[in-house]
Amino acid sequence: MRSATPGPGSGPSEGRGARSRGPAGAAHPAAAGEPAADAEDGTGRGPLRYAAAAFVFAVGMAGTTLPTPLYGLYRQELGFGELMVTVVFAVYAVGVIAALLVAGDYSDKLGRRPVLLAALLLSAASAGCFLLEGGLPLLFCGRLLSGFAAGLLSGAATAAVLELAPGGSRGFAATAANMGGLGCGPLLAGVLAQYAPRPLTLPFATHLVLLAAAGALTLALPETARPPRPRPRLRPRGMEVPRQVRPVFVPAALACFTGFAVFGLFTAVSPGFMSATLHIGNLAVSGAVVFSVFCASLLGQSASARTGAPVALPLGCLGLVVGMVQVGLSLLLGSLVLLVTGAVTGGIGQGLAFRSAMTTVSRRAPEEHRGGTISALFVVAYLGISLPVVGVGALSTGLGLRNAGLVFSACVVALASGVGAWLWRTRKSAAAAPAPVD
């Protein structure tokens, strides 16, 4: 099973019989055999339908990162500190993990379109919470709903894009749609907030318009899944890491944790770094820096497919080390160039590490435990995107944001170095390990 994963988003496997994923692409076994799109190759697929599915995916994921350049404005308006910014951000991960564990395979059981529509409605409700500007409770509610939406959307949309894309580009198509959406969210919000009126309203109103268009396209898409008849009971999915998978799961999960921690740093507090340390208050620039991280991750994931997981995984850790050294230097020297360079290098490292970790774990896990194992991997990854960044916020109350960022950078460098060295020493045995017989 070859995994091609987008970032906090999805990770498809390629080939016929695409499977429904969890929030960031956890592969869940299909409930009813071959998807309808494969059975109707002449009518189910096509460039317009594939483009429509990719647009739906990108628009939905853009909502999860849309608030990134705006947190500083909320902080000024509502009077809370950097710690609360990171807590508001991290609530998103709670929603994603809950959706992953409860509803990761619902699109197999109910069909792609119903789950996509539910995800878009949740995303619209999230945007509505931000539009109301009702203080911290609505910000928390908006972020939680955004996490639920991402959890539902990534599984169903990844599968839909895979099933509608041309055969040779399925994995990259889903990855590009996911990462493109995640990157365009802060870029769109930053540009609108900087150069248009009503900076806390217009980005979310624009997103609602895009969501309406995505909903209309979803209704026009062919149903690519064949839900079983009668429909099975909807029940939560479990997590399980079989004993034979644990030797590769532990380092792969640590690499995912570290890579997602870098994502969390940039999507939660990099605008604060730029304002407080680099004295750059342009929100469009802040959004562009975050955009560069996700674009770089896409490049890293593409390179991972060509390099091979046993080599790409330790190389990804090396990229995370170099990237965070550059971020630390940017904070010490007040250099935007070093911050952008660190964003790109760290993003490439995250992409290499994440996709190769997915590939390694999914290949080693037996078929009957694959969904639960990958679910566990994503729980670790989303803990990485939330817990460390809350630590940065907590440290900033006593040390200041600059010093908290330096401590974070040092911790990531230490963890990624240790995991990378471990993976490099064991790469030959990992490459030689046989895949389970399904």
Task: Give the positions of each predicted feature.
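Helix-breaking motifs and short loop linkers at transmembrane-helix boundaries and internal kinks
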Residues: 79, 111, 132-137, 197, ...
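Conserved MFS/SLC helix-loop-helix module at the cytosolic interface between two early adjacent transmembrane helices
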Residues: 97-136
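Paired small-residue
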Residues: 137-146, 337-345
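Cytoplasmic helix-loop-helix junction between adjacent transmembrane helices
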Residues: 142-178
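Helix-loop-helix hairpin linking two adjacent transmembrane segments in secondary transporters
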Residues: 167, 172-219
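Transmembrane alpha-helices of Major Facilitator/SLC transporters
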Residues: 286-309, 323
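C-terminal transmembrane helical hairpin of 12-TM major facilitator-type secondary transporters
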Residues: 312-355
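A late C-terminal transmembrane helix in Major Facilitator Superfamily
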Residues: 358-403, 408
